[in-house]
Structures are given as C-alpha cells and as structure tokens.
C-alpha cells in the first residue's frame, strides 16, 4: 500500500474501503434514534436547549477554547503535507500516518488517565499539546531540528484525543441525556464550523 499516495490509486482504495464499510453497516442491528416518532420542534432545530448550556461559565470557556483551538486546524489539514515535504520530510504520507497511530494509542490511554487527572487537567494537557505541536512545526524547518517535525506529528494523539475526544465526553456529561445530541452538534459547529472558517 505504500507509495500509492502520489497516485490516483489512493482514491480507488478509499472507494473500495467505503463500499466495504457500507456493506458491513447493513449487517448491524437496527438502532432507531431515541427521538424517533416524536414531533420535531423549531427550537430543536436551532439547538436552543444546547445553547442554554453556555450559561455556566465553565462550559462557555470550554466552548470558546474549542473554537479558538480549531482556528489553525483548517490550515493544518490543508497545508501540513506540503509544508513537511518542503521542510525535507521524505514519504510525507507515511510520516503523517504516525499521527493517526498515536491517536489510537492515546485513545486507549484516556480511560486510564481519566480518573487520575480528571476532565480539567486532560483538557489543559490537550490545549498545551496544541501549542507545543505548532511550536515544533515552526522550529523544525532546519536540518538539525527536523526531529521536531516528527515529534509534532506524534503529538497528534495527545492534541486530538486529550482535547476533542475528552471535550466530547465532557459535553456529554454536562448536557445530560435529553440534549446531548444537540450539545454535541453545537460543539462540532463551534470547532469544525466557526473555528475552521
């Protein structure tokens, strides 16, 4: 599979994986939405109950931080591969895949650290990791500092999992059963919507 990232074969592979996952999804058990059969209200479409969660200061601060952390993400997603190539990293797609591997590792670490650190400290570690990561990318353009680029890539797991995944868990806890779907949608709007504009 290595080496196809520079060809159109990567899209063929993605299409085949998508078809396989679509076929697999047909074998999953029927799970209707919790609100199935209930009337749709206009306030539900506007996520009015979720916006009420912004009244407590702690959730408002989290939402603002999530939005601000997402501002450079659009640039990261669009330009990191070309930036790494220009900085002299060989086989960029393989190098960047180590970021996803670290994400899997840290996803497994979250439950172990959740009890010890709690939500607040895990979010703080995640935010600090974003800062450190971008600093590594800024400082790693020289030949001597190239290892910082690789460390920045490996920090992807801490950055994403400790902030976004823990943030979604936190949102789920704060929102409660009734509005957790709206609350998750609102956070996605703040991060991948407003933040990445």
Feature-to-residue mapping (PLM):
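Helix-loop boundary and gating motifs at the non-cytosolic
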Residues: 58-66, 70-95, 164
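C-terminal ends and interior cores of transmembrane alpha-helices
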Residues: 128-143
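Loop-to-transmembrane helix entry/capping segments in MFS-fold secondary transporters
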Residues: 90, 175-188
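Helix-to-loop junctions at the C-terminal end of transmembrane segments
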Residues: 2, 105-119
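Loop-to-transmembrane helix entry
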Residues: 8-12, 85-104, 147-148, 185-186
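C-terminal membrane-cytosol helix-exit motif in multi-pass small-molecule transporters
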Residues: 16-35
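Juxtamembrane intracellular "pre-TM" segments in multi-pass secondary transporters
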Residues: 30-63
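Intracellular juxtamembrane helix-capping segments at the cytosolic ends
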Residues: 162-176
């Amino acid at each position: 599979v290595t080496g196809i990232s520079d060809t159109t074969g990567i899209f063929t592979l993605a299409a085949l994986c998508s078809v396989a996952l679509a076929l697999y999804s047909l074998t999953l058990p029927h799970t209707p939405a919790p609100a199935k059969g209930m009337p749709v209200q206009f306030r539900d479409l506007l996520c009015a109950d979720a916006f009420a969660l912004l009244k407590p200061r702690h959730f408002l601060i989290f939402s603002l931080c999530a939005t601000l952390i997402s501002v450079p993400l659009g640039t990261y997603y669009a330009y990191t591969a070309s930036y790494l190539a220009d900085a002299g990293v060989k086989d960029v797609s393989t190098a960047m895949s180590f970021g996803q591997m670290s994400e899997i590792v840290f996803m497994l670490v979250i439950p172990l650290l959740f009890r010890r650190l709690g939500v607040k400290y895990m979010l703080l570690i995640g935010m600090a990791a974003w800062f450190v990561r971008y600093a590594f990318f800024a400082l790693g353009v020289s030949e001597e500092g190239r290892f910082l680029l690789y460390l920045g890539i490996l920090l992807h797991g801490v950055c994403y999992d400790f902030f976004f995944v823990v943030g979604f868990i936190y949102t789920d806890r704060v929102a409660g059963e009734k509005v957790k779907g709206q609350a998750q949608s609102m956070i996605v709007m703040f991060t991948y919507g407003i933040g990445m504009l």
